[in-house]
């Protein structure tokens, strides 16, 4: 479809906004293989961006990354959320710090830029968890120009009826506002503390922040 539309309308860049492009690795491999083959001979090469799941090298291989680059991928956004495995496990993100390191390394090796989507001030985030996020930013500074944007937002808001609010209804006090919640098991993580952490993270990552 992308090839057909590009040839018909002269549009060569596409953005995916409603799903994770590598949710099914079989479908993803078919996708990048076809685009890589097309781009190898096309006068006007296709490029694309979208949201992608962070996967380690066993799940998303070196060959997958090579084809990803040849398919025209760039500025892929991934929900990294936190530098702490413990926090991500609570979110059910299902990838380790090693997976993340491999993901970032392969993206850099193949010249595919990334965007990090972050959540600062998740209810279970301790001081040490937050420090792990800061250490993650420091760790990736060696990859020059790899991470084009880090989206920090303000701080985590919790809405009534969402899974987070429902699953922790007895420990999470919403206090009539999505930003003013208090988690009884982590009471020092106040709204003021969460905002402070967001500011510190923005100063530490050294990248563009929104």
Label for each model-derived stretch:
Residues 17-23, 53, 120-124, 151-164:
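Short, solvent-exposed turn/loop segments enriched in Gly/Ser/Thr/Pro and often Arg
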